[in-house]
Amino acid sequence: PFKFVERIQQDRIVLEKFADYYDADRIKIERVTYRPIPDTTVRLANLQSGELDMVERIAATDVGTVNQTDGLSLQEVVGLGYMAIYANIGNGDRALTPMGEDARVRQAFSLAIDREALNQVVFDGTARAGNQPFPPTSQWYNQDLPVPARDVEAAKALLAEAGQERVAVEIQHANNPVVTQMMQVVQAMVAEAGFDVTLRATEFATLLSEQTAGNFQLSRSDWSGRPDPDGNLHQFVTCEGGINDPKYCNPEVDRLLNEARAVTDPAARKALYDEAGVILNQDLPVIYLGHQTYIFALDDKVQGFKALPDGMIRLQDVTLAE
């Protein structure tokens, strides 16, 4: 609904209304300026001063400040995607570890994590704890696979069953403050169960290329999510999946997810995803940690905006009061 006007590197992108857009009557704003501001404190300060009308995805730690500021409001929505740790199961020599070779070790690692505590410490309780590719708000969420409570003794028992007392493992993660804090909390939690974790921070683009190349043992990454459940699963966990970086392969999972692609009845599809989810919850090529909440902060003069779970900003029917 908008057309490009100008781009000033590291400063702004300016768009203006495209009059020939098919739905142009619903676009009430003539001009939009997007400003990249990496620092969350600076973003909030600009909103408070009136320099900005809206901030996309404020820090969870700033929610209280916004709530206490006259003239500002919040909109929050749980995203479609997930936060997770990918386990290298078959992608080269770095898969040849207890973590990569034995699902019991991965199960022990998962059981040693208190997902709700992780949410409270890192996200001030604004995220959702999770253990599936779908958030609890999704129709595809399997109610029969609730988030497991942390159980250090059960984790130790699984390690012993796998013939392990302590397991050394490296987790690579993006070098941003929130993810770093998250992994430090996980590192401390799983240590109590017998995991000696080394953290390796890297640029996100490098992290993705390392995943593809198999140069990882565990890798912490996010997925933004898709409205259709296929987009959160098939490409990640089928044998020939395009971004199946762990190189996990289970023919039964392939069968179920391929069949789900061909079924149109939602209830029948959900039954297939539920069945695949049970297997994935045992094999754990992906250790799901939770689901981010998209938090938008707005000046009260912005009216008609609605936060949506894909995190996209849509300006149909949005107005700016004088």
Model features per residue range: what roles?
Residues D124-D144, I295-A297:
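Mature extracytoplasmic/periplasmic domains
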Residues Q292:
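Short beta-strand/turn segments that mark the catalytic/cofactor-handling region
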Residues F296-E322:
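Long beta-strand-rich cores associated with HINT superfamily self-processing modules
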Residues F2-V5, T126-A127, V302:
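Short glycine-aromatic motifs
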Residues L289:
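Active-site-proximal polar cores
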Residues P133-F134, G231-H234, D300-Q303:
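Short aromatic-enriched loop/helix-cap "lid" or pocket-rim segments at secondary-structure transitions
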